[in-house]
């Protein structure tokens, strides 16, 4: 039989062996520096608004994605195109455009009131539903089919 001191010394080891505690690194190790347009503007292109493409290897490590050097080389032109496109978007002058909630509307335009409607042919609609359990409509599973 174990003494209390011996049992106390063994129990933490058993707990660690049966259920390891995962040590998560601090958030700072995922992103050594914040990713933003201001941190990725090259000094030479600061006036032109061009963005520097991110380091794919560092991003892949941060996202816990394995990326071979060949894959990184293949993705580099594609990422550069996306970054260039965002650089073009940053160069667009938006000062003369009024802000709106959605395209074609303004902040003072009114949308219809969101309120429930009753349908005259509700019974016909319910009869057409193959699997109806009042008040729910049962549909086939879409995600996680097994």
Curated annotation (Swiss-Prot):
Keywords: ATP-binding, Chloroplast, Ligase, Mitochondrion, Nucleotide-binding, Plastid, Protein biosynthesis
SUPFAM superfamilies for the chain: Glu-tRNAGln amidotransferase C subunit (SSF141000)
Entries under InterPro entries matching the protein: Asp/Glu-ADT_sf_sub_c, GatC
A family per Pfam: GatC
Subcellular location: Mitochondrion; Plastid, Chloroplast
GO molecular function, one term: ATP binding
Any one GO BP annotation for this protein: mitochondrial translation
Stretches the record annotates as Disordered: 28-53
Gene3D superfamilies: Glu-tRNAGln amidotransferase C subunit, N-terminal domain (1.10.20.60)
EC class name: ligase
Main localization (coarse): mitochondrion
EC code(s) of this entry: 6.3.5.-
One term under GO cellular component: mitochondrion
Catalyzed reactions: L-glutamyl-tRNA(Gln) + L-glutamine + ATP + H2O = L-glutaminyl-tRNA(Gln) + L-glutamate + ADP + phosphate + H(+)
The protein's role, per its UniProt record: Allows the formation of correctly charged Gln-tRNA(Gln) through the transamidation of misacylated Glu-tRNA(Gln) in chloroplasts and mitochondria. The reaction takes place in the presence of glutamine and ATP through an activated gamma-phospho-Glu-tRNA(Gln).
Subunit structure comment from the entry: Subunit of the heterotrimeric GatCAB amidotransferase (AdT) complex, composed of A, B and C subunits.
Homology family: Belongs to the GatC family.
HAMAP family referenced in this protein's UniProt entry, alphabetically: GatC
Note: This protein may be expected to contain an N-terminal transit peptide but none has been predicted.
Full protein name: Glutamyl-tRNA(Gln) amidotransferase subunit C, chloroplastic/mitochondrial
